[in-house]
Amino acid sequence: MRKSIAIIITSILVLSGCNKQQSVSDRLLNEVEKAIAINPDSASNLLNSISSPEKLDDKTFARWCMLSGKITDEIFNSILPTYQLERAYDWYSSHGSPDEQVQILIYLGRSYFADGDYDKAMSIYTNALDIAGKNKLNNLIGYTYDYIGDLYREKFMRTEAIKRYEIAAEYFKKEKNTDSYACALRDIGREYAEMDSLSHALHILIIADSVANKTKNIEVTASINNALGNIYAMQNKYDKAEKYLLKALLTGREKMPDYVA
């Protein structure tokens, strides 16, 4: 009898310790979520303070992965490895909202893209489009098409890339998502430039610049300025090129902003 009681007490203590640890992790993730929009670098440091995220339960680990992806969208650090995002998707596919399922699939596709597994990334993006389309998640449809465009760009299939960027731009425009609309236009212009259609590229980028003037996101405006500067340089219009490239250097980071703005 005493032995049974001792086992029960030990079990309660162990469970209590686990619950306490989980509660601390939940509170920390709440703080990370609040900090992302205000100070994403601080949010990243907070998230990294969880030393062994793989020991979290599936629900909390999935949330940890989602927040890591959102931080990546802000500070352009490396996306999580596929095995972690696969585990996160396993949980969201059963328990998450359609929005969460599509978002985690986008991160998973980007991770496979980073690994160079383009076929797997395309399969995942196709799944994301199916869920987003059924639930009329227009912004997420736009993001997914943008990343599909990146896949085609990586394969030097520029016409196919442009088609996807154009579809993305239409969805962003429809949703009044100014930042992502400007980024999609930037990418259309970039592809035309790669195809030596410099005048058309410039036309698209001037539109992107006028769209970006409506945003307070300096990373977006810097990326448009950088693209314009490069186009003018390719046209040997060096005064204009210098003007836009200097504007980009003075305001932006070293990496271009992502579509999820």
What are these regions (language model features)?
Residues 1-4:
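Positively charged n-region of N-terminal signal peptides that target proteins for export
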Residues 7-14:
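Bacterial N-terminal signal peptides
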Residues 18-261:
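A "functional boundary" signal
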